[in-house]
């Protein structure tokens, strides 16, 4: 697994509080949480035992790329459309 994507509308507490630390412990290198209520994509990198060392917020109008595939860009606004 190079990238795991969670789409969260009502599950943000579960995704951040339980799943994210578990993904970090499992060594998943990158997690994106598509945060629909706040209209951002939370990008987590650098896994460790407690979660992730790096967190970045990306908003509509920005482009993001998985660290493992930097040439594959995604328009954040497209991920946030309902």
What name fits each language-model region?
Residues 1-26, 33-82:
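C-terminal interaction segment
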């Amino acid at each position: 697994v190079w990238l795991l994507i969670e789409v969260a509308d009502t599950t943000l507490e579960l995704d951040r509080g339980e799943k994210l630390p578990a993904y970090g412990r499992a060594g998943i290198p990158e997690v994106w949480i598509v945060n629909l209520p706040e209209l951002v994509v939370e990008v987590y990198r650098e896994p460790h035992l407690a979660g992730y060392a790096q967190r970045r917020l990306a908003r509509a109008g920005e482009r993001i790329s998985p660290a493992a595939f930097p040439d594959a860009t995604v328009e954040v606004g497209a991920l946030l459309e309902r």
